[in-house]
UniProtKB/Swiss-Prot annotation:
MF annotations from Gene Ontology: ATP binding; RNA binding; tyrosine-tRNA ligase activity
Gene name per UniProt: tyrS
Residues bound to L-tyrosine: Y34, Y164, Q168
Residue window of motif 'KMSKS' region: 225-229
Reaction catalysis annotation: tRNA(Tyr) + L-tyrosine + ATP = L-tyrosyl-tRNA(Tyr) + AMP + diphosphate + H(+)
GO cellular component, one term: cytosol
InterPro entries: aa-tRNA-synth_Ic, Rossmann-like_a/b/a_fold, S4_RNA-bd_sf, SYY-like_C, Tyr-tRNA-ligase, Tyr-tRNA-ligase_bac-type, Tyr-tRNA-ligase_bac_1
Record protein name field: Tyrosine--tRNA ligase
Motif residue range(s): 'HIGH' region: 39-48
Record's subcellular location: Cytoplasm
PROSITE patterns given in the database record: S4 (PS50889)
Keyword field: Aminoacyl-tRNA synthetase, ATP-binding, Cytoplasm, Ligase, Nucleotide-binding, Protein biosynthesis, RNA-binding
Length: 413
């Protein structure tokens, strides 16, 4: 199986502008390619893992990655289908860009990667040069036909967001001309921007050897966006989302989803994935595929030590042990892996559920209690008026609060 065929088998290729050329280039040559990440937040999310995996697979084949962090395009914002983006300040955009670059350098440790920030060149273009030298090459009708733009026309789209496509096209042109980049990689929602970049290269450089490849967007089986956990974004930054929450998310994916995730989000070879698929069909209750997926992802974005902490945390939380069976070292670990909330005085259980984010409101917290889904340690609490006091603690300070089977928080006096 050729490298291109492996990418197709992994469901990592959705669109390419010239399949014959892309296959030839990826299978038989060394290509310099780029993938862009806009710093709209302080961290990447698990939704970016598909691009990161693609970069690693391309590297393993000998191709050369250029990672573009969009310090300039992050100031503008890629148009959303539903509403106008809130503009970032220059300070926030550059700070986010620095954070994301650091995050990617950690994940791509010991790999040969070139990092660039488009603020370096886009910020140098004055408005007259922008309109004369580049704007005249973009046809308004062509831009209006792009999916996101077309969806926003009824509700309205600003010229700022409308111009984003041009800026990303200039990125591809700049990297093609100055860094010898021939291929752009991006999610399928970026395909319109990728093809615009190919077009501007053709018009300005009089060449048609640039190539573009898009990966599919991952959705959960219910159609929701991949990486959402009860309406919470799963960030790769451990200070924003605990590694254990990500561990739990992937450990609980369905048998229907897990094999596709193994293909798209890990470097596990085809033989290993097919073996896991067979074992899942034979003994789904063992969840061997989910465990392999989870271990691979936590190792990639965090470390093997953190993976072991997550495994140990899982053992503690699902042991169904009596309160007196917990050891103090268990809580020292849980302080690192769970959402931890400090209090100085007694607190109503209803308030504690909201403050630990196990409930979004007091009314929801009361419903959880009525439904018998709330436990202190492993004991169900049925009283709406229950007050958490220091007498409920272990080792004079710890309260383990549980909602259902999968949601936990630690309260510390």
């Amino acid at each position: 199986m050729s490298f291109y065929e492996e990418l197709k088998w992994r469901n990592l290729i959705k669109d390419c502008n010239n399949e014959i050329q892309v296959k030839e280039l990826l299978d038989n040559n060394q290509v310099k390619f780029y993938c862009g990440f806009d710093p709209t937040s302080h961290s990447l999310t698990v939704g970016h893992l598909i691009q990161i995996t693609m970069i690693l697979l391309m590297q393993r084949q000998g191709h050369l990655p250029v990672i573009l962090v969009g310090g300039a395009t992050g100031l503008i914002g890629d148009p959303k289908e539903t509403e106008e983006r809130k503009l970032l300040s220059l300070e926030n955009s550059l700070q986010n860009a620095k954070s994301i670059e650091s995050q990617l350098k950690t994940i791509l440790l010991n790999k040969q990667v070139e990092f660039v920030n488009n603020y370096q060149w886009l910020s140098q273009i004055d408005i007259i040069s922008f309109l004369r030298n580049y704007g005249k090459f973009f046809n308004i009708n062509y831009m209006l036909s792009k999916h996101v733009v077309a969806k926003r026309l009824a509700s309205g789209i600003s010229f700022t967001e409308f111009s984003y496509m041009i800026l990303q096209s200039l990125d591809f042109h700049h990297l093609y001309k100055n860094h010898k980049v021939r291929l752009q990689l991006g999610g399928s929602d970026q395909w319109g921007n990728i093809t615009s970049g190919l077009e501007i290269i053709r018009k300005l450089e009089k060449k048609s050897d640039a190539l573009g490849v898009s990966t599919p967007l991952l959705l959960n089986s219910d159609g929701t966006k991949f990486g959402k956990s009860e309406k919470r974004v799963l960030w790769l930054n451990p200070l924003m989302t605990s590694p254990y929450e990500i561990y739990q998310y992937f450990l609980n994916v369905s048998d229907k989803e897990v094999i596709n995730y193994l293909k798209m989000l890990t470097l596990i070879p085809k033989k290993g994935i097919l073996e896991l698929e067979k074992k899942t069909l034979e003994n789904p209750q063992k969840r061997l595929a989910q465990k392999a997926l989870t271990q691979s992802i936590i190792n990639l974005i965090h470390s093997s030590d953190i993976l072991q902490e997550c495994i140990k945390t899982n053992q503690i939380l699902f042991s169904n042990a009596k309160k007196e069976s917990f050891q103090e070292k268990d809580f020292i670990l849980l302080q690192k892996t769970l959402f931890c909330h400090s209090i100085k005085e007694d607190i109503l259980l209803v308030d504690a559920l909201v403050q630990t984010k196990l409930a979004t409101s007091k009314s929801e917290a009361r419903e959880f209690i009525k439904d018998n889904t709330i436990k202190l340690f492993n004991q169900k609490i049925k009283s709406l008026d229950f007050i958490i006091t220091k007498e409920n603690t272990l080792f004079g300070k710890y309260i383990l609060l549980k909602k259902g089977k999968k949601n936990n928080a630690l309260i510390v006096f």
